[in-house]
Amino acid sequence: MVSEFDLIRKYFDRPARNAVLGVGDDAALLRPGAGMELAVSTDLLLEDRHFRAGADARMLGHKSLAVNLSDMAAMGAAPRWATLALALPAANERWLAGFSKGFFALARRFGVELVGGDTVRGPTGGPLVICVTILGEVPKKKALRRDGARPTDSIWVSGKLGAAAYGLARRDDMGAARRLHMPEPRVALGLRLRGIATAAIDVSDGFAQDLGHILERSGVGAVVHYDMLPKHRIEDRKLERRCVLSGGDDYELIFTAPAGSGARVRALARALKLRLTRVGSIGRRRDLRMLDANGRQMKVERGFDHFSR
């Protein structure tokens, strides 16, 4: 019978060249670079809440790290190390092989080393639980934060919105389904936004709700033009609005930047070959006004909240 430590050695023990000590001891030892601050974020994925039972293991390995990388992107931090904790209903080696393949393929792309974690057998028939903590570095006082937006700043968003939520609602759209299961973290964008953006956040719970976090922390409001939002193509207009504004799981970046920085942002878009769209502006009135093509205010649904009913 395979043991917990056999599983760790076989599927998750990799050389950690940028850590003093990695997997295999009671704790990892890390050495941040001189003049750097540590950015730390944790995300938990729960079966039947964040992914369906039977989800492809390789894609799940990718997504479990990608959502954490997206937090690093939103902070303008360079990802460095991660820990992984799993609560497994059973020791399924085929599943573990696929999961670790997806996890480490993405980790290699972004230079992330797995330096620790834990595995536990959960209740028989119970849900699979995946918890990743990621650590990154950012130069002192250079991190992108949620509390820096100022009146007259422009509001920008990367990529397109709504694909992941549409992929969950309609399984026949393969492109949308891929966006749901294998999101692309905007790490390069986050790093390049240092010195340009005044505030940033990733779109995990829905555009409206996540922009709302910036507004709340910054003590400001916003006017957003719905028709300017970059959207995944969805024929049903009602479903489109729900997916775009409150669907979540897009893992694009919303950021604010001074009104005069448009040329720099557009140059950055060209350099990264990434769509960056100006969608509104920050104001002093502390609310979010979403306007339709005729300038009428739209009702905006809240995004995802684990404890709302």
Give the role of each language-model region.
Residues 1-309:
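Helix-biased detector of long, well-ordered alpha-helical tracts
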